[in-house]
C-alpha cells in the first residue's frame, strides 16, 4: 500500500486532479448515480471524460485518477482498458458487495474530499499479461488485473 499524497502528481503540484469516470451504461442505477455524483466530483476535481462504453483512450498523460461506477467486473474491465497506462482507481460499488469496489455511493460522498487532498492509501495490484504463440507467431495477447 502506498500513501497517495507521496505519489499523486496533483497533490505534489497543488492542483485539482483530472478525473475520468468509467461506468457500464447497461448496469442498473448507473445513470441515476452519475447524475448525483458528477456535481460532487466536479466540485473537487476537473472532469476529463465520462466513459459509458469502456472505450476511452487512456494513453493521454493528462489524467490522474479513474472513478469506476459499478462492481468488481467494471473495475477489472477498466484495468484492461487502461492496459499499460494504469492510473489509481476509486471503485464505487453500485451492486452487491465487491472485493475491489467496496465503497458504496453514500460513503463516496464522505471520502471524496479526502481522496483529492491525498488523505488516502493506494493499494497496488499486479497486472498480468498472457500471450498465446503458435508456430512462433503471437496469436493473441490479454492483460488482466491480479486481484
What are these regions (language model features)?
Residues 2-70, 74-85:
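N-terminal glycine-/serine-/threonine-rich phosphate-binding loop
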Residues 26-27, 94, 104:
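Short, glycine/serine-rich, charged loops/turns that create anion-binding
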Residues 37, 77, 83-86, 104-111, ...:
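Alpha-helix termini
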Residues 77, 81-95, 99:
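Gly/Ser-rich helix-loop-strand patches that form or flank binding pockets
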Residues 99-147:
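Catalytic core of DAGKc-family lipid kinases
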